[in-house]
């Protein structure tokens, strides 16, 4: 919500500075996002009148003007296309200071003397108009300072409202809050009822009363929309970031900003018969005011006449029924549309309007008539015309209602950590428009007004008290409770410790969205039906992720595009597998790695990370809870991974994750020009460990044997190690694969595996005969089962 400070102070004016007001609003939960001046920093600019113009003798696009400041006449050379006799414009006289530290001096343009400058909006930083001079009203007093005339010593305050505070999406709502914060009186403008000057009405039929419980319409005849919108209204709209269009549209926008009630003006000549508020027919077409043609769905509420749809209710009007400069009769609409009926409709059609923004957050249903009278009065004042009677339809059973809320003093003390005097409680709540009745026993019965849709519980009232009293004034009271640590199996690992482990291995934690682009989902999961969101934030966040990889890879792209060549990230979060029926939400731990193996340094190379580097990180995670030997890595297939660099991770035969390099085709589609490795693990399987078994350290020496084995190239090293373990006996304490070789001196169909075996007995020294016998058993089993022999 953006508004002019001067406009706000016209409603309520606490005796505080702008800075204090802004700080107080933010502390009350209405966070001020920005404060911007209404105009640039300039001085010496007055209202000037162009008395005459003539062509510059040496320049086709320049004109020599005689300009009056009310007491003197000055010659000014100007190249603006709209300069003409009788025009009143901002006139920067000699010595004037313009934004950008630009000082006006006497000058010669193509040999003709110029004593000042006629200014555009952009040159004074009053809006963005740079296509000509800023035209002031014909009644602007010549010679008056422009800053004074336009009240430019003002600022636009932008408040970032939370979705539950739709009541503050208007100047009336903001004034109500400021009045409550400072115990200041709010001067709400009187809105008199406009008497009917004729009896013409258009019948209104509401066919969807649950979606539109209240609808008001009024015919206003003989308006002149060629008349300009008054400068004071244009300026208030500009300072609220609303562009002036024409008198009718400006008035409806102004009333919406002022009171919070969206309105719409139809060209009466384009309405066939009466008004029907109905649900759209499936496939019905409508060209909107922005020129976009939309195909309506049957769940969309529309305003229609007897032949076609005229507008999407609460979102945007249609082009063919919109008002133009030629419109002579208008039909004003002021309605209350249910939040649920409007919610998400604008986004579903790729739209976002001020009206939909308000209806989605809630509009006070009691505002409709006041807003209609206010808009009618302004329309008659600015454009002339004759107003007819208001026609209204009302479905009371579908209007929102809030039951009274009981507030207890005891509960206030409990939640805020302090007591608030009963009279102060009543004063604060009454200032917000709530009706408070005390029962004399430390309780109040509070009736909630129709504009506060966010108050329905006792805690909501206590929140209001805390806001108005001041969060910074609440005492610091530490909670006192008997807390018992949560019981947890000793063998179970915890996520924070796993995070610390990965950070220690050079990873950084990432947090990505659970909803992703459908195209990205298809790239990682071709042929899989995604879980679609009914009301997505945007089109590229429309499906739930079935893996953490898409978000991590997108984060990787973001970093690579910013010259971060070495990226190691992990994330823990939920993945969503299946559809709504039988949906599985599974906690996962995933990572992405790209770049060099080690950080840049003089003592280490710049070798790129490879599959086995990432596998080592995964093994560290799997072994964290003491159960590494329960996991196995087997060759696997995954549509997102390289067919030759993919490992499926299993635990007791169950699939618990994947590790591998991004598939080359996927990398190409994602614009990745370097190897990228990813892993993803089921968190519950990783965390499930084993209790360590402690035993006395042996005082006797270890015995080590290194074996160089020749095996077929397609034999997995893990198979060789499994056979060795089975035959190495109970005193084997360590088994390591420390070299793999293929090349000169080796059969091209074979490979050499070098393994180290270590034995140690807890109570005696092992002799060579025992170790040699065991080694021979190992070699015999390897040859029989895997055709693996000792290299000679």
Swiss-Prot record:
Record keyword Calcium present: no
Principal location: cytoplasm
Taxonomic superkingdom: Bacteria
Keywords noted in UniProt: Aminoacyl-tRNA synthetase, ATP-binding, Cytoplasm, Ligase, Magnesium, Metal-binding, Nucleotide-binding, Protein biosynthesis, RNA-binding, tRNA-binding
Cofactor binding description: Binds 2 magnesium ions per tetramer.
All copies of domain tRNA-binding, residue ranges: 39-147
Group of enzyme by EC: ligase
MF terms in GO: ATP binding; magnesium ion binding; phenylalanine-tRNA ligase activity; tRNA binding
GO biological process: phenylalanyl-tRNA aminoacylation
EC identifiers of the protein: 6.1.1.20
Gene Ontology cellular component annotations, sorted alphabetically: phenylalanine-tRNA ligase complex
InterPro entries from the UniProt entry: aa-tRNA-synth_II/BPL/LPL, B3/B4_tRNA-bd, DNA-bd_dom_put_sf, Fdx_antiC-bd, Fdx_antiC-bd_sf, NA-bd_OB-fold, Phe-tRNA-ligase_IIc_bsu, Phe-tRNA-ligase_IIc_bsu_bact
Claim: Nucleotidyltransferase is one of the keywords in the record: no
Domain FDX-ACB: 698-791
Residue positions binding Mg(2+): 454, 460, 463-464
Catalytic activity reported: tRNA(Phe) + L-phenylalanine + ATP = L-phenylalanyl-tRNA(Phe) + AMP + diphosphate + H(+)
Subunit structure: Tetramer of two alpha and two beta subunits.
Family per similarity comment: Belongs to the phenylalanyl-tRNA synthetase beta subunit family. Type 1 subfamily.
NCBIfam families cross-referenced by the UniProt entry: pheT_bact, YtpR
Protein name per UniProt: Phenylalanine--tRNA ligase beta subunit
The organism of origin for this protein: Pseudomonas fluorescens (strain ATCC BAA-477 / NRRL B-23932 / Pf-5)
């Amino acid at each position: 919500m953006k508004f002019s400070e001067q406009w706000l102070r016209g409603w309520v004016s606490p005796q505080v500075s702008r800075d204090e007001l802004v700080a107080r609003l933010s502390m009350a939960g209405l966070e001020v996002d920005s404060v911007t001046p209404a105009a640039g920093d300039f001085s010496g600019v007055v209202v000037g009148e162009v008395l005459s113009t003539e062509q510059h003798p040496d320049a086709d696009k320049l004109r020599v003007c005689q300009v009056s400041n009310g007491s003197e006449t000055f010659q000014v050379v100007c190249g603006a296309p709209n300069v003409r006799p009788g025009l009143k414009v901002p006139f920067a006289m000699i010595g004037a200071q313009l934004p950008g530290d630009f000082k006006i001096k006497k000058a010669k343009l193509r040999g003709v003397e110029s004593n000042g400058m006629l200014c555009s909006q952009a040159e004074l930083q009053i809006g963005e108009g740079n296509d000509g001079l800023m035209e002031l009203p014909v009644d602007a007093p010549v010679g008056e300072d422009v800053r004074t005339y336009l009240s430019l010593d003002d600022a636009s305050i932008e408040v970032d409202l939370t979705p539950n505070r739709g009541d503050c999406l208007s100047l009336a709502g903001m004034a109500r809050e400021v009045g409550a914060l400072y115990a200041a009186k709010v001067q709400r403008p009187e809105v008199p009822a406009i008497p009917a000057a004729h009896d013409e009405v258009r019948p209104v039929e509401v066919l969807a009363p649950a979606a539109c419980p209240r609808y008001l319409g009024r015919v206003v005849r003989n308006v002149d929309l060629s008349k300009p919108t008054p400068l004071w209204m244009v300026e208030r709209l500009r300072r609220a970031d609303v562009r002036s269009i024409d008198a009718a549209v400006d008035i409806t926008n102004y009333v919406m900003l002022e009171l919070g009630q969206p309105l719409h003006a139809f060209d009466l000549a384009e309405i066939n018969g009466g008004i029907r508020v109905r649900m759209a027919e499936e496939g019905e077409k409508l060209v909107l005011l922005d020129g976009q043609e939309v195909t309506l769905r049957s769940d969309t509420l529309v305003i229609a006449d007897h032949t076609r749809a005229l507008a999407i209710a609460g979102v945007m009007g249609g082009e063919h029924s919109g008002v133009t400069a030629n419109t002579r009769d208008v039909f004003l609409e002021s309605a209350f549309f249910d939040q649920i009926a409007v919610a998400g409709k604008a986004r579903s059609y790729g739209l976002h309007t001020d009206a939909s923004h308000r209806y989605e957050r809630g509009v006070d249903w009691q505002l409709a008539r006041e807003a209609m009278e206010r808009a009618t009065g302004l329309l008659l004042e600015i454009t002339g015309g004759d107003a007819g009677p208001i026609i209204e339809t009302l479905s009371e059973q579908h209007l929102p209602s809030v039951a009274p809320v009981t507030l207890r003093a005891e509960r206030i003390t409990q939640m805020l950590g302090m007591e608030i005097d009963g009279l102060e409680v009543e004063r604060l709540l009454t200032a917000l428009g709530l009706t408070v009745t005390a029962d004399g026993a430390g309780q109040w019965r509070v009736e909630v007004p129709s504009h506060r849709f966010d108050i329905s519980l006792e805690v909501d009232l206590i929140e209001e008290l805390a806001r108005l009293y001041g969060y910074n004034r609440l005492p610091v009271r530490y909670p006192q409770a008997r807390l018992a640590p949560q019981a947890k199996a000793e063998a179970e690992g915890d996520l924070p410790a796993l995070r610390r482990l990965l950070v220690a291995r050079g990873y950084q934690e990432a947090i990505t969205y659970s909803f992703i682009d459908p195209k990205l989902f298809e790239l990682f999961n071709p042929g899989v039906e995604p879980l679609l969101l009914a009301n997505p934030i945007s089109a590229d966040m429309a499906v739930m992720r079935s893996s953490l990889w898409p978000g991590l890879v997108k984060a990787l792209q973001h970093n690579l595009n910013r010259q971060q060549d070495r990226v190691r990230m992990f994330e823990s979060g939920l993945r969503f597998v299946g559809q709504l029926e039988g949906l599985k939400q599974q906690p996962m731990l995933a990572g992405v790695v790209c770049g060099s193996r080690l950080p840049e340094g003089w003592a280490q190379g710049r070798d790129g990370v490879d599959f086995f580097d990432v596998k080592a990180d995964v093994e560290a995670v799997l072994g964290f809870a003491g159960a590494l030997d329960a996991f196995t890595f087997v060759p696997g297939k995954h549509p997102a991974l390289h067919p030759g660099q993919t490992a499926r991770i299993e635990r007791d035969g169950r699939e618990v994750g994947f590790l591998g390099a991004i598939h080359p085709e996927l990398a190409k589609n994602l614009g990745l020009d370097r190897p990228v490795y990813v892993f993803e693990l089921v968190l519950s399987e990783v965390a499930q460990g084993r209790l360590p078994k402690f035993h006395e350290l042996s005082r006797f020496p270890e015995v080590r044997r290194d074996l160089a084995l020749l095996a077929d190239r397609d034999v997995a090293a893990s198979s060789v190690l499994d056979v060795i373990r089975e035959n190495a006996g109970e005193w084997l304490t360590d088994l390591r694969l420390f070299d793999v070789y293929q090349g000169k001196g080796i059969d091209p169909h074979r490979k050499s595996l070098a393994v180290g075996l270590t034995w140690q007995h807890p109570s005696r020294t092992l002799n060579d005969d025992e170790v040699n016998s065991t080694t021979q058993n190992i070699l015999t089993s390897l040859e029989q089962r895997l055709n693996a022999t000792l290299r000679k």
